[in-house]
Amino acid sequence: VKFKSKFVLAVLCAAVSSAAFAGKDEDQQIKFRQSAYSFTAWNCSKIKSQVVDHPETFNKEQVIAAANSIAAVANSGLGALYGPGTDQGTGWKKTRLKPEFFEKQDEVKKVALSFNEEANKLAKVAANGDIGEIKTQFGELGKACKSCHDKFRIKDE
């Protein structure tokens, strides 16, 4: 029931955010998008530190909070922040979104769903507190992120 309530809340947030951001200019969409991914990266670094790099520091509650934060971003309706023209422009910094993102919507859908599924699985696994399972699922989330980056993100210069 708790998961179902969170799912309904996520769907409502996605609907509201889609409507709210539909009229924002491209740079604002890029800024919001970059903020969401920076927040995700910060939470991933907390999990990596406690599960991969320094498992002796594992704190179940902190890892659960980080995993839930990542899942919240994945369920937040980020697609609304990829409006036409957002492959160019500057948010906090110049976007690295490739123009192919808008040309390959079937592939975009696959990577977006993968990110969503793996983030939600990570939150579920984290709640159980098994560090080995968390590490494995964290790796699966990393693969989902890498898949999108490899296809749709301009490499750092």
Regions found by a protein language model. Give the residues of each.
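Sequence context surrounding c-type heme c attachment/ligation sites in exported
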Residues: 23, 27-157
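Cleavable N-terminal signal peptides
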Residues: 9-10, 20
